[in-house]
Design a protein with these regions (language model features):
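Non-catalytic C-terminal accessory modules of carbohydrate-active enzymes
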Residues: 76-103, 110-112, 390, 522-532, ...
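Aromatic-rich carbohydrate-recognition surfaces in CAZymes
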Residues: 136-137, 158-161, 170, 232-234, ...
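Catalytic cores of carbohydrate-active enzymes
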Residues: 271, 389, 393-399, 440-522, ...
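Glycine-rich phosphate/pyrophosphate-binding loop
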Residues: 196-230, 415-432, 540-557
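Carbohydrate-binding/catalytic loop surfaces
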Residues: 278-299, 337-356, 360, 364-367, ...
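Glycine-rich, acidic and aromatic/proline-enriched surface loops and short helix-turn segments
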Residues: 275-283, 326-334, 597-604
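Inter-helical turn/loop segments and adjacent helix faces that build the functional surface
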Residues: 250, 364-376, 445-461, 515, ...
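Terminal accessory carbohydrate-recognition/targeting modules of carbohydrate-active enzymes
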Residues: 1, 6-265, 269, 295, ...
């Protein structure tokens, strides 16, 4: 299978950039490289939220080093980076195969020993299970497991200190330990009787090259309480469990097998993305969120509404859409009333957020029916549109010309949100092109929806508003070259060629006629299209910077100045199919190949946040990004409708 990688494992330049991510619905995850060498401070075998400490994830178990012992000779399978490009103990040399079509599985060969290691992250609790199978051996074999503990937030590092507790208690077939107050106890158990040797030790100066690349601190010390030793026979499987509650060792085998049976294989582009889509769901008590990405993003309002249709409707999970919308609806209602949001959705006050919520509900209406959308969400849609028309939004001013004006001079208010020294890198302000495209689309969609529901008065009023808005949109944004200005504020017109003009070609309702739409599509195709997404700025525009590398400030300047983003390509493909219909299908399918190629690089089976805008278009940023996965899923679904 394409998910099986053999020859690249020995070469760390090939294997270290490839990461795997497994999550559960509570926000906990397991993330590392395919050779099990942690290269980010976010990496770990068991990383979990600790709500009584803060709103961050915490690395409890950083890694587990295995040693194969035969005839008194020890072969250590672990891998860590230390100072001066020094890797130790170089366990990757023994890897013969890595496969993650079903679950991440690594096969090691040490002399006559063949050992298979398979990892699974349990769906309904914070627990990782690792199954070791001795496929072949010619003499008595012992396994030794050495756990590296961190007990720290993903944003910080730990260093050798005297506060760390060295205490541990024996539990069935294992131990439990907790390094600091406020943390849950970590239970490490095997399904077979074993010896635990207490040998407390700090491993100093472990380095994370990805953090170094990004200009951050990059070294720490990890605590090893000792090691487990267990004999293993040819054909036998032993399971190691790490979790925050005790488990009966007798249950480990069946738990592992039940979890494996529950997984969708990553055997196609669609299945990879569908698996990835499930990873962004985050349930906390009654609330259901969508995380913007892994490993560092929380739930951001815009990202949630943009990605919701692709992550749920496009994989036929309408109930999941409704669950997330229930949480979002509470937040929207509180926001409209001027009360605290009351849940963990961030950036609710950005001016385009409510309009993206309308767009998400519009996709729901297309996937279910307008009647169902009206019955469930009609009042919410009317409240949103009324709130904006009554000029009650803090940063959306409805002008006489029907356009929405937003102030972004001092604060980044759109998805192009990078700031340096507190100032927006791109001060998009005034009439912003996608906000007004969203506005026109929302007016027309809600007008049609309420007219069908019998409210002709409101429908007429919204249509009249849309007429004014549409006319002004064309007058204000369209320039003599046939493309759209990115934003207009008084005499300030931004002529940069940016992807924000594509939305109005993609949306169901647009103020542009077909000729105007095609002109926009043409310039986007010529100047912004790459195999990995749309560039955020044309190479012909001033300030083009396609490489998202270096320390934070350098990256912030490049973030939306030429880097390519896959989610924009979703809207681009929708626009392309809107213009070319059936005859556009083969082009769109070819255009997806560049993203399908990503399934075996970066975060295996997912799409990273962004790419460099020039060849070789390297993946950058967060390893798995919700809007990207969602929009490509939405396009795959759209293509399947054309291909019926």
């Amino acid at each position: 299978s394409e998910m099986c990688i053999r020859d690249r494992m020995i070469n760390l330049e090939e294997s270290l950039p490839r990461e795997i991510l497994r999550t559960n619905k509570s926000g906990a995850y397991h993330c590392t490289t395919i050779v099990d060498c942690n290269t980010r401070k976010y990496h770990g075998l068991l990383v979990i939220p600790v709500p009584n400490l803060d709103d961050e994830n915490h690395v409890l178990l950083s890694s587990l080093d295995e040693t194969v012992i035969q005839h008194g000779a020890e072969f250590n399978l672990g891998l860590h980076k230390y100072q001066g490009n020094h890797f130790s103990p170089n366990g990757h040399k023994y890897i013969r195969e890595f496969d993650c079509e079903h679950i991440p599985a690594t096969t090691y060969r040490v002399g006559g020993v063949i050992l298979r290691k398979e990892k699974i992250f349990v769906h309904h609790e914070n627990r990782i299970l690792i199954r070791y199978t001795l496929v072949d051996a010619h003499s008595a074999t012992t396994l030794r497991f050495r756990p590296f503990l961190a007990f720290r937030s993903v944003r910080e590092y730990t260093h050798e200190n005297s506060q760390a507790s060295r205490d541990y208690q024996l539990v069935e077939n294992g131990i439990k330990t907790c390094m600091y107050p406020g943390y849950p106890e970590l239970f490490m158990q095997l399904n077979k009787k074993n010896e635990f040797h207490y040998e407390p030790n700090w491993y100093r100066g472990i380095e994370y090259p990805k953090e170094q690349e990004r200009g951050y601190d990059f070294n720490e010390d990890l605590y090893v309480p000792g090691y487990f030793e267990v004999d293993i026979k040819k054909g036998e499987s032993i399971i190691f469990s790490a979790g925050i509650s005790e488990i009966s060792p007798r249950r480990l085998k069946q738990t592992f097998e039940a979890e494996v049976a529950d997984r969708t294989p990553r055997d196609s582009f669609y299945h990879c993305l569908k698996n990835s889509a499930h990873q962004f769901h985050n349930k906390q008590e009654e609330d259901h969120y969508i995380l913007a990405g892994y490993p560092w993003f929380k739930c951001r309002a815009r990202d949630m509404f943009v990605s919701l249709p692709g992550l749920t409707l496009a994989v036929d999970e309408i109930g999941e859409f409704e669950d997330v919308m229930e949480t979002a609806r509470k937040a929207i209602n509180n926001y409209i009333k001027g009360e605290p949001i009351g849940c963990k959705i961030y950036e609710m006050d950005d001016p385009d957020v409510l309009l993206w919520a309308v767009w998400a509900l519009q996709q729901y209406a297309k996937e279910t029916s307008r009647e169902q959308c009206r019955a469930k969400y009609g009042s919410l849609l009317e409240e949103i549109i009324d709130f904006i028309r009554q000029r009650k939004h803090d940063n959306l001013f409805l002008h006489e010309n029907g356009l929405l004006y937003a102030n972004g001079a001092d604060r980044a208010i759109t998805w192009m949100n990078s700031t340096v020294n507190g100032r927006p890198v791109i001060p998009r302000t005034g009439y912003i092109v996608e906000i007004n495209a969203l506005w026109y689309n929302a007016l027309r969609f809600i007008a049609d929806l309420v007219r069908e529901g019998g409210n002709g008065l409101l429908a007429d009023s919204l249509d009249a508003q849309a007429e004014v808005t549409g006319k002004s949109f064309v007058e204000v944004f369209r320039n003599e070259y046939g493309y759209l200005l990115d934003y207009v504020d008084g005499n300030m017109m931004d002529w940069s060629v940016r992807p924000n003009m594509i939305f109005t070609v993609a949306f169901d309702y647009s103020p542009l006629d077909r000729v105007q739409k095609k002109q926009v599509l043409d310039i986007v195709t010529k100047e912004l299209l790459t195999p990995k997404g749309l560039r955020t700025l044309s190479p012909k525009s001033g300030g083009y910077n396609p490489n998202y590398v270096g320390p934070q400030i350098q990256r912030d300047y490049a973030y939306h100045q030429g880097t390519a983003w896959p989610w924009l390509m979703g809207f681009y493909m929708e626009a392309y199919l809107r213009i070319y219909k059936m005859s556009g299908i083969s082009f769109v399918e070819r255009q997806l190949i560049g993203l399908e190629d990503e399934m075996t690089s970066h975060c295996v089976g997912s799409l990273p946040e962004l790419f460099d805008g020039n060849p070789p278009f390297k993946g950058r940023g967060a390893v798995s990004f919700a809007m990207n996965v969602a929009e490509i899923l939405r396009i795959l679904k759209l293509l399947s409708k054309y291909n019926l």
